């Protein structure tokens, strides 16, 4: 069966990339509150665990793809880099992120930049490390985005990808299924005023090639020493690979 593309608004005249940018622009003002509220704050723990995967390599510069408002970029400061780039296609999310960087007095290190993950505006072999938090399932062309990520990494550089997955074990599978299908869309709609944005979340998670399937895609593209770590009973997975 052909793979069905999951888009936030399912508009025939717009690409997935356009709809994703529009969606995040629409919810940018309430995104941080909703993100931490709906994840019960666990997303912060996941990011810290993901960043710890990069402690095995020297990190002078790092790019956070699909950075949103920059939470992962801020978490990357634990690695003491000299330069952090936060790249995103949503101008609305970046505007919120820029104010966050100024408020936290880290705007001299973290640069928020408008850009496309499938056409990263940096030279090949430029970054020591790369992170993506809950962003790869939003790529219009998953393999192209992953290929671009590999291109901008230096030889020996490391990519760490944090993404939602589907728990397999009782009772986490049942609890997460109910939570993602009903609780998140209900509160997301009322707080963000965008009904589709938080219905898109469980739909995009369900369609994403997780686990071994995603590892095979990474291997096919050219990532090496690929590892995956389940967190919180499989609600999310941390993938890591070397160039």
For each feature predicted by the language model, list its residue ranges:
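N-terminal auxiliary segments of SAM/dcSAM-dependent transferases
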Residues: 1-22
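Conserved alpha-helix/loop element of class I SAM-dependent methyltransferases that forms part
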Residues: 30-33, 39-60, 75
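C-terminal alpha-helical "lid/dimerization" subdomain adjacent to the S-adenosyl-L-methionine
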Residues: 18-19, 89, 162-217, 221, ...
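A short acidic, Gly/Pro-enriched loop at the edge of an enzyme's catalytic core
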Residues: 118-129
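C-terminal lobe and adjacent flexible extensions of AdoMet/dcAdoMet transferase-like proteins
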Residues: 219-243
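Hydrophobic beta-strand segment of the Class I
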Residues: 31, 130-131
């Amino acid at each position: 069966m052909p793979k069905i593309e999951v888009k936030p608004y399912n508009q025939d005249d717009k690409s997935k990339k356009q709809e994703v940018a529009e969606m995040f622009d629409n919810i940018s003002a309430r995104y941080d509150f909703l993100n931490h509220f709906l994840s019960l704050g666990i997303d912060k723990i996941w990011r810290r665990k993901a960043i710890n995967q990069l402690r095995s390599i020297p990190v002078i510069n790092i790019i956070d793809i699909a950075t949103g408002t920059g939470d992962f970029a801020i978490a990357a400061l634990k690695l003491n880099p000299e330069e952090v780039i936060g790249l995103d296609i949503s101008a609305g999310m970046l505007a919120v992120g820029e104010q966050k960087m100024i408020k936290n007095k880290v705007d001299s290190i973290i640069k928020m930049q408008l850009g496309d993950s499938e056409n990263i505006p940096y030279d090949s072999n430029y970054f020591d490390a790369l992170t993506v938090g809950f962003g790869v399932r939003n790529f219009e062309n998953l393999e192209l985005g992953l290929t671009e990520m590999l291109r901008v990494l230096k030889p020996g550089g490391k990519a760490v990808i944090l993404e939602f997955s589907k728990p397999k074990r009782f009772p986490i599978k049942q609890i997460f299924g109910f939570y993602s299908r009903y609780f998140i869309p209900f509160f997301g709609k009322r707080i963000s005023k965008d009904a589709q944005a938080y219905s898109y979340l469980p739909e995009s998670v369900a369609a994403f090639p997780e686990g071994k399937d995603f590892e095979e895609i990474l291997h096919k593209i050219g990532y090496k020493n690929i590892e995956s770590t389940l967190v919180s009973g499989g609600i999310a997975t941390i993938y890591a690979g070397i160039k």
